[in-house]
């Protein structure tokens, strides 16, 4: 009986650690139809570091149908996207803009990119939007980052 207790306790600990690590590692896909595969991502404020991986599951090149992942306060995302269009290639983001909390480079079909960011910059219950800054994509390619 003791062995069963310890086996269950160990399994429970491993499962809770796996669940915790999954909220510190995020994955999102983008496609040639100007879509992310989710409208909502969740992250734990307690994470020391968050790793986000963007995978472009389409086939078109970055100069035709490039995608990136950008995080900002919801109140800033449209202005950042518009400034990014003016900034142009390769990443369609204004350089050194403090409103950008995290961002990947623009990638093309079949590529993936990962970044790490510090969730200490974020507030539990804050209003955060992720989006693609490739020209015109932010209108369709956006979603919420929920900090728990």
Model regions and ranges:
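Beta-strand cores of secreted/periplasmic/IMS beta-sandwich domains, seen most often
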Residues: 40-64, 69-71, 114-123, 127, ...
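Extracellular/periplasmic metallocenter environments
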Residues: 102-148
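Positively charged n-region of N-terminal signal peptides that target proteins for export
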Residues: 1-4
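Bacterial N-terminal signal peptides
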Residues: 6-14
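Sec/Tat signal peptide C-region and signal peptidase I cleavage site
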Residues: 15-21
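Extracytoplasmic/periplasmic copper-protein system
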Residues: 22-31, 75-93, 135-148
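N-terminal edge beta-strand
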Residues: 23-49
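Mid-chain, structured segments of secreted extracytoplasmic proteins
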Residues: 60-61, 65-108
């Amino acid at each position: 009986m003791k062995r069963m207790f310890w086996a269950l306790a160990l399994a429970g600990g491993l499962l809770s650690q796996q669940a915790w690590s999954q909220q510190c590692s995020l994955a999102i896909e983008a496609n040639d139809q100007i879509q992310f595969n989710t409208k909502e991502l969740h992250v734990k404020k307690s994470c020391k570091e968050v790793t986000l991986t963007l995978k472009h599951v389409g086939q078109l090149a970055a100069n035709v149908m490039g995608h990136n992942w950008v995080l900002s306060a919801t109140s800033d995302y449209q202005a950042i996207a518009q400034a990014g269009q003016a900034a142009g290639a390769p990443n369609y983001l204004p350089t050194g803009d403090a409103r950008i909390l995290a961002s990947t480079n623009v990638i093309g079909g079949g590529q993936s990119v990962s970044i790490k960011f510090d969730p200490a910059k974020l507030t539990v219950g804050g209003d955060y939007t992720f989006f693609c800054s490739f020209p015109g994509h932010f209108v369709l390619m956006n979603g919420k980052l929920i900090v728990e």
